[in-house]
Design a protein with these regions (language model features):
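Post-signal peptide N-terminal segment of mature Sec-exported envelope proteins
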Residues: 34-54
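Beta-rich interaction/scaffold domains
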Residues: 49-110
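Active-site-proximal alpha-helix that buttresses catalytic centers in soluble enzyme cores
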Residues: 101-301
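Bacterial lipoprotein signal-peptidase II cleavage site
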Residues: 23-38
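Bacterial Sec-dependent N-terminal signal peptides
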Residues: 1-13
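Hydrophobic core
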Residues: 14-22
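Residue-level recognition of short, structured coil/turn motifs
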Residues: 23, 91, 159-160
Length: 301
């Protein structure tokens, strides 16, 4: 009887040992599967991040290629390629765009509705053209309000003349074209357009502040085309002629100084400069600055 019980006990112990082995084996398999899954997930995530970075770098390189560039035969295609590549990115990838000059704001920043602007690059100019030349801005709302506002005012004042536009900053032209599809003429394009349209009388009105580098470059371009027209006239920039030293202040500078001061006083909520002075209010006017000899204009102002 005791032999039978001993055999039963031995059988039970053996069965338990076998079950334990099976259970241990199952647990090991589960652990291995979990580790494998985690490794696979990490690898997939790393691969995805690498793909995101590569896509973002591609766009950054395309932006850098057009950011500061003299216009050439590839500019139009490069602008289109950069925008198409940007549009194909995910939101996550767009945040990763970073290059020498490139960043997410190049395409991603909302500066207003470009459709409200008018590039004024149409043909059918006629005999008389009034070319408004500006440095330019890539901020759509500002361009519509300021530059287009000036152009529209000139067109209303001189209805017998065709008002056209040119920007002197190719960096701005490329940005607006790539982001918004709006093609604005640079100086050479605008002058070529005038010649091709048979313009006889050309008046150039710059919106530049002073006789700086941009104004000088504009004049150099105009001089190469003077013999293509019957007459060419170029207006002064806003602050007029520079003057030989800080003590020589022309009427243009005096008029501008009075105008901006009056605007600042009004914006601050005062009826007069004296009223602002009584409240010990000071107005500070800030300029961009320049290494050009025209920097004396700031002292004159």
């Amino acid at each position: 009887m005791r032999k039978i019980e001993t055999k039963k006990l031995a059988a039970a112990v053996t069965a338990l040992a076998l079950c334990a082995g099976v259970l241990t084996g199952c647990g090991g398999a589960a652990s291995g599967t979990a580790s494998s899954t985690a490794a696979s997930s990490a690898s997939s995530e790393a691969s995805s991040e690498g793909a995101d970075e590569m896509a973002a770098k591609n766009v950054a390189d395309l932006i850098d290629a057009i950011y500061v560039q003299e216009r050439n035969e590839d500019t139009d295609a490069q602008c289109e390629a950069a925008k198409a590549a940007w549009d194909a990115l995910t939101d996550t990838q767009k945040e990763l765009v970073e290059g020498e000059n490139a960043d997410p704001d190049y395409f991603g920043r909302d500066t207003g509705d470009a459709s409200k602007d008018d590039a004024r690059n149409q043909d059918d100019i006629g005999d008389n053209e009034l070319l408004v030349v500006s440095f330019g801005t890539s901020f759509n709302d500002s361009r519509v309000k300021d530059i287009k506002g000036i152009e529209d005012a000139l067109q209303a004042a001189y209805p017998d003349w065709s008002v056209r536009r040119a920007f002197t900053a190719q960096i701005i032209i490329n940005h607006v074209q790539a982001r918004d599809g709006e093609k604005i003429d640079n100086m050479q394009q605008a002058m070529d357009r005038a010649v091709e349209n048979g313009v006889k009388n050309l008046v150039v009105q710059p919106t530049h502040l002073m006789h700086g580098a941009e104004y000088d470059e504009m004049m150099e371009m105009i001089d190469t085309y003077r013999d293509k027209f019957e007459s060419v006239a170029v207006a002064e920039p806003l602050l007029g002629e520079v003057g030989s030293d800080a003590t020589i202040i022309n009427q243009d500078k005096e008029d501008v100084a009075k105008a901006v001061t009056a605007a600042a006083v009004k914006e601050a909520g005062y009826d007069s400069l004296d009223a602002a002075a009584a409240d010990k209010v000071a107005f500070v006017f800030m300029g961009h600055g320049t290494s050009h000899t025209a920097k004396v204009s700031y002292s004159q102002m």
